A protein has these predicted regions:
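Gly/Ser/Thr-rich loops at beta-strand to alpha-helix junctions
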Residues: 17-20, 135-139
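Surface-exposed, charge/polar-rich loops and edge strands
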Residues: 60-63, 67, 97-98, 106-108, ...
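Conserved ATP-utilizing enzyme core subdomain
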Residues: 70-96
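Short beta-strand segments
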Residues: 12-17, 103-105, 131-133
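Short, basic/glycine-rich phosphate-binding loops at helix/coil junctions
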Residues: 36-41, 92-100, 181
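Flexible, glycine/proline-enriched loop segments at strand-loop-helix junctions
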Residues: 44-52, 74, 103-110, 189
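A short aromatic-anchored loop/beta-hairpin motif
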Residues: 1-68, 72
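Short acidic (Asp/Glu) patches
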Residues: 43-47, 79-86, 113-116
Length: 232
């Protein structure tokens, strides 16, 4: 995907792995890495990604949220979790592009995250890449269970709904936003997302884009269908 994109001047990541009471933005100049995973080989805890932070962008994000009536705060001590540094290491391995991270809100309310995305429309920052890092299927028990026709059917039904919701140009934006706000009504939604933190980065990205996605990329991971969406 990075090869198809103009190289950004900075990156804003919304990761499924960070929740706070209010939206919180990393604002340090040299973010550390948070190895927030367990049971992996020792090499997984030696990964390095020494990208710079971008305090000016962090302040702009906080101001955009404040102007939309959304209280936010800066955190100059927190580093980047693996929802940020893993995709960034694959996309931009030289680690020269400044990066900041924006938390989810721990209520996990879909409409709140759509509103956060809409607030980010006020950002005035040239060539900013906004990366929603999550998973369109995140039932860990099902990932490691034997694949069955029933599990596959549930997975595919939700993926089809999500692709249509994000990509169907015949939907109006109010219709698209309502479907995402009411995502629990989708086929097998709670089977695919027993907890919704891995879905909500998508809501922030759609709230910012406010249009049908330009591209859908399907992938199979541990036998389960998953989808990624690109807005240009």
């Amino acid at each position: 995907l990075a090869a198809d994109l103009r190289k950004p001047s900075a990156i804003l990541v919304i990761s499924a792995h960070w929740e706070e009471a209010i939206p919180t933005i990393t604002s340090g100049t040299t973010p550390s890495l948070i190895y927030d995973y367990y049971g992996f080989p020792s090499e997984a805890y030696k990964i390095e990604y020494p990208c710079p932070g971008e305090p000016v962008l962090a302040q702009q994000v906080a101001q955009a949220l404040d102007q939309a009536g959304i209280q936010a705060r800066l955190d100059d001590q927190r580093g980047l979790d693996h929802g940020a540094f893993v995709p960034l290491k694959l996309m931009y391995p030289d680690a020269t592009i400044p990066c900041i991270q924006l938390s989810l809100v721990n209520t996990l309310d879909a409409s709140t995250h759509l509103a956060i995305g809409r607030a980010l429309q006020a950002l005035d920052y040239d060539h900013l890449l906004v990366l929603g890092s999550g998973f369109s299927f995140h039932n860990m028990r099902a990932f490691f269970a034997a694949q069955t026709p029933e599990i596959q059917a549930r997975n595919l039904a939700f993926e089809d709904w999500l692709e249509q919701t994000c990509s169907d140009s015949s939907l109006s934006e109010p219709e698209r936003a309502k479907r995402l706000a009411d995502w629990e009504q989708a086929p097998h939604a709670r089977f695919c997302h027993p907890r919704e933190e891995h879905l909500l980065p998508l809501h922030v990205c759609y709230g910012l884009a406010n249009k049908a996605s330009d591209r859908h990329i399907a992938a199979t991971i541990l036998g389960k269908q998953s989808g990624m969406f690109y807005w240009g």
